[in-house]
Amino acid sequence: SEDETRLVKNLFSGYNKVVRPVNH
């Protein structure tokens, strides 16, 4: 569902920020 995709995207975004803060 759309909500699920949004949730996964949000989770992935936060994960990337924590794991690779140098990327951005």
From Swiss-Prot:
Subunit composition and interactions: One of the alpha chains that assemble within the acetylcholine receptor, a pentamer of two alpha chains, a beta, a delta, and a gamma or epsilon chains.
Keyword terms, alphabetized: Cell membrane, Ion channel, Ion transport, Ligand-gated ion channel, Membrane, Postsynaptic cell membrane, Receptor, Synapse, Transmembrane, Transport
Location(s), subcellular: Postsynaptic cell membrane; Cell membrane
Catalytic activity: K(+)(in) = K(+)(out); Na(+)(in) = Na(+)(out)
InterPro entries: Neur_chan_lig-bd_sf
Regions annotated as coiled coil: none
Primary localisation category: membrane
Membrane topology, record value: Multi-pass membrane protein
Protein name in the entry: Acetylcholine receptor subunit alpha
Gene that this polypeptide is encoded by: chrna1
This protein's record includes keyword Transmembrane helix: no
Record keyword Membrane present: yes
Family designation: Belongs to the ligand-gated ion channel (TC 1.A.9) family. Acetylcholine receptor (TC 1.A.9.1) subfamily. Alpha-1/CHRNA1 sub-subfamily.
GO MF annotation: an example: extracellular ligand-gated monoatomic ion channel activity
Function: Upon acetylcholine binding, the AChR responds by an extensive change in conformation that affects all subunits and leads to opening of an ion-conducting channel across the plasma membrane.
Gene Ontology cellular-component annotations: postsynaptic membrane
